[in-house]
Each structure stands twice: as C-alpha cells, then as structure tokens.
Amino acid sequence: MSKIQTTFQRLQAQGRKALIPFITAGDPDPTLTVPLMHALVAGGADIIELGVPFSDPMADGPTIQRASERALAQGMTLRKVLQAVREFRSGDADTPVVLMGYANPIEAMGQQAFVAAAREAGVDGALVVDYPPEECVEFAAASKAAGLDPIFLLAPTSSEQRFADVARAGSGYIYYVSLKGVTGAGTLDLDEVARRIPQIRAAVGMPVGVGFGIRDAESARRIGAVADAVVIGSRIIEEIERSPREQACSNVTHFVKGIREALDTLPGVKQ
C-alpha cells in the first residue's frame, strides 16, 4: 500500500477529510520551497501537491500562472523540484508529496527516468494534467511498479468511459475538477459536486479530492462534507504573493490551519 493510500486509510478511520494544499516549487524563490512545504504540514496538510512550473500551464488560472512565471524566472526546473523534495524528506519522511504539472518536462527527461528519479527523491504521486489515462498506459504502469501513484483528473463533463479509463490507470486518489475552466475561477455548484462524487467514487473505487473554486474555510467545509479530500491552491499562492518574504511561511501556516480546523468540525470526526 502506498503512502497516499495509507494516509487516506488513516484519515477514514478517524472520520476526517484529507487537506491537500498546493504550492508552486520555486515561488516566490527556490530557497523558500522547502520551508513552505514544512509550513503547510505545520498548518495541518495531509498531502502536499507541489507544482512543477511550466511556461504554458493551460489548466491554471492567472494566479498559478504568475507563480509559474516567477519560479521559471528564478531558474526552477524539474530536476530542482526533485532536489527540493529530497531536502524536504530529510526533515519529513511521512507527508506524501504529489508532483503536479505538465507532460513536456517529463518527456524531456524521459518517462522511465522521471519515475526513477521521482521515487529516489521521495515523491509519492504524479498528476500530469495533459496525460489522459487512455494515452499513458505505459507511464501509469511504470509509476505503479515503482510505487508512485499516477493521479488523474475528472471533470463535470467526464464520460463513463473516462471513469473506466481512470479506474484502470490511476491509483491513490482522484482529483475532481469542480468547475469548468481554469484554477482559481468561478463559483462552486455544491449540489452538482454532491451529486457527482458518489458516482465517481463508485466507478473508480478511490478517494475523491475536489479542487478548483475553494477559497476559504467555509467553502472547504462545504466540499469536505461530500468529498474525501479538499484541494486548495490559488488561494495559498495569493497568500504567498501578498506576504513579505519573511512572513510567508507563518502566514501560510495560519491560513492552512484555518482550513484544517474547519474540516475537523465536520460531523463524524473522532476527537
């Protein structure tokens, strides 16, 4: 059983929901990436999604695009992201880390080389936005063989066939995109999310995390009432953007802690 699967199993036994915050590696500068990862854990993160900056992040809204631009301007690369995970692991052997990004940097490194390097660094999962499950069978198989969970996106428009493809190729959890469009945009339709989550869970047999459109403790709590995990990214990037550098980590911890506390007031949590 993978570290991600073990985390969800533990949380389920506690009646708790997973909190999965996202930051972009290298933003606001590479020296803050590892401290910010520890700050997320201090705030109550169960799993960290670490963004690999890319020059054309098609699924990301302006906030995460800006984070990618800042990181790339500082010289952040996939290999440097892996080095950051390695450094994080020297102080935290337990918190699962999922790399989230795009195919181009992985293809440049080579899929097999990426899988090996990611596992060696201490990465637990990879969510590659433009790797549809039906087209990356070899990557998914190689990832699973190495103990790396391949994680896939589902959306309100996803078909039953896509559910089946994701169930076959994926492991760890599903990232359900709760809005049509890009990250950080729009408003949540909670009724639609609540209707879709049981369908997805039954079809894929994995925990379902919901992201896109979650901006505060209240929206996180509302999503946590129906999902297995809450994914929050753009709002954390905004917190980093508006913070003086020396206060970024403490401000991020404070913000994440508020989300964690809201999730832990949901019915069913075993105190």
Swiss-Prot record:
GO cellular component annotations of the record: cytosol
CDD domains: Tryptophan_synthase_alpha
Gene Ontology MF term list: tryptophan synthase activity
Matching PROSITE patterns: TRP_SYNTHASE_ALPHA
Active-site residues, Swiss-Prot/TrEMBL: 49 (proton acceptor), 60 (proton acceptor)
The protein's Enzyme Commission number: 4.2.1.20
Pfam families: Trp_syntA (PF00290)
Reactions this protein catalyses: (1S,2R)-1-C-(indol-3-yl)glycerol 3-phosphate + L-serine = D-glyceraldehyde 3-phosphate + L-tryptophan + H2O
UniProt pathway: Amino-acid biosynthesis; L-tryptophan biosynthesis; L-tryptophan from chorismate: step 5/5
Listed InterPro entries: Aldolase_TIM, RibuloseP-bd_barrel, Trp_synthase_alpha_AS, Trp_synthase_suA
Keywords attached to this entry: Amino-acid biosynthesis, Aromatic amino acid biosynthesis, Lyase, Tryptophan biosynthesis
Protein function: The alpha subunit is responsible for the aldol cleavage of indoleglycerol phosphate to indole and glyceraldehyde 3-phosphate.
HAMAP family for the chain: Trp_synth_alpha (MF_00131)
Assembly behavior: Tetramer of two alpha and two beta chains.
Similarity comment: family membership: Belongs to the TrpA family.
Name of the molecule in the record: Tryptophan synthase alpha chain
Organism per entry: Azoarcus sp. (strain BH72)
Lineage of origin: Bacteria, Pseudomonadati, Pseudomonadota, Betaproteobacteria, Rhodocyclales
Gene: trpA
